[in-house]
Design a protein with these regions (language model features):
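Accessory interaction regions appended to the cores of large information-processing enzymes
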Residues: 1-232
Length: 232
């Protein structure tokens, strides 16, 4: 019924529920994570989980060239990690978790090491604009797609966000060059599934879910207001 009515959802990154102890200290949920990975991938997994405030409790070799890792880790440290985990272990890793209890807040976590490519203006993405934008990172859209200012249209391999104008058309002149006649080649866009998009979004971003489209956007669409908010 909701699909038929054309409803749209704006979904934020998952958040955990914090508690406060009798001394006013902030507490957060902690989980025990049991991770079975091929030995050659154990170093990468340990590094990633440690960056997410995980504490390695044990490391045991098991059958088939696998290593079993045991971590104590904040629940929020596992948010958005499973997709990354499957990539790092080439689909050969297994991770199981169980709730351990509440402990003192472990500190801030940087969920994503990359930035976003953000649409500069409303309009329709064109080949020329996308061709110039693809040098900045990985695109999530192709030509002909409608975009709006503040919409995320790709991923920047560096940490900062960049505004790009994917609606920009080539300035036409009366003089034609040989290079102008060459077709612009676009790298196929990376199409995110619902699960991948939920893993990707950062705390200042939203995922718009409609019956026909998935769109990622900044919570604050206006670039000036977004800049001011980030300065606070």
């Amino acid at each position: 019924n909701m699909r038929r009515e054309g409803y749209e959802f704006a979904v934020s990154k998952a958040e955990v529920l914090y508690h406060t102890d009798e001394r006013g200290k902030k507490l957060e949920p902690i989980e025990l994570a049991y991770v079975d990975v091929p030995e050659e991938f154990s170093g990468s997994v340990i590094q990633k989980l440690s960056q997410r405030k995980g504490e390695l409790l044990g490391m045991t070799p098991i059958n088939g060239g696998y290593t079993r890792l045991q971590f104590s880790i904040p629940s929020r440290g596992l948010i958005g990690y499973r997709g990354e985990f499957m990539t790092d272990t080439k689909g050969n890793g297994i991770i199981n978790t169980s709730f351990e209890g509440y402990e003192e807040y472990k500190g801030d976590i940087s969920y994503r090491k990359t930035g976003s490519l953000i649409a500069y203006e409303d309009g329709e993405a064109v080949t020329y604009g996308l061709f110039n934008a693809q040098d900045r990172g990985t695109l999530f859209i192709g030509p002909g797609e409608k975009v709006y200012a503040g919409m995320i249209i790709g991923e920047n391999p560096r940490t900062e966000d960049i505004e790009v104008n994917v609606c920009k058309t080539k300035h036409l002149t009366n003089t034609r060059s040989s290079s102008a006649d060459e077709a612009l080649r676009l790298v196929p866009p990376k199409i995110l599934s619902l699960e991948q998009a939920l893993d990707y979004i950062d705390t200042d971003e939203l995922l718009e879910v409609t019956p026909t489209h998935l769109r990622i956007r900044k919570k604050i669409l206006d670039s000036t207001l977004r800049y001011r908010a980030n300065k606070k």
